[in-house]
């Protein structure tokens, strides 16, 4: 992916945006990819190296990354696992997902989200429900007891 800086944002923001992008692997499907249409997903993978995005369009992505960084720095309790990537082979593909927090005492997966207040105004959380359901499934496949999931939403506006 080609990252541009057409609005001349500070260099650290541009550098962060460039360091954050990894080419997608052909046989790996990330949990967040499941919320995309199949054509969108495969076209993105096929043309990733041609795609262009300006750093000014990534500010809210950086905000979300900053929130996750703060949460990740919090001390993990003995009954908690945080920011862990799980993978499950399904045929020729690998389903890969990184959950934010699993609490073994509560048997709950927590996912931190940054969003607009409009997410709540429109009351459509189906994408979040799908994502956390897959995290629950991946954790169960890895041998953990999971009773459910919760979302901690931080609204940016």
Provide a role label for each language-model segment.
Residues 142-157:
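Substrate-binding beta-hairpin/strand module that engages nucleic acids
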Residues 1-109, 116-129, 140:
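Metal-dependent nuclease catalytic cores that hydrolyze phosphodiester bonds in DNA/RNA
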Residues 111-114, 153:
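Residue-level recognition of conserved beta-strand positions in structured domain cores
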């Amino acid at each position: 992916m080609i990252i541009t800086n057409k609005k001349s944002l500070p260099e650290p923001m541009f550098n962060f945006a460039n360091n954050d992008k990894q080419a997608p692997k052909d046989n790996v499907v990330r949990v967040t990819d499941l919320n995309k249409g199949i054509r969108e997903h495969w076209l993105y993978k096929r043309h990733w190296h041609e795609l262009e995005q300006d750093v000014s369009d990534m500010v809210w992505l950086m905000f979300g990354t900053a929130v996750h960084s703060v949460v990740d720095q919090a001390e993990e309790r003995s009954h908690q696992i945080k920011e862990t990537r799980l993978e499950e082979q399904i045929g020729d593909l690998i389903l890969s997902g990184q959950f934010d927090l699993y609490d073994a005492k509560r048997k709950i997966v927590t996912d931190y989200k940054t969003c607009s207040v409009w997410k709540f105004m429109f009351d459509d959380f189906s994408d979040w429900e799908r994502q956390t359901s897959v995290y629950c499934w991946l954790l169960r496949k890895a041998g953990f007891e999971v009773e459910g999931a919760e979302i901690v939403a931080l609204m940016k506006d």
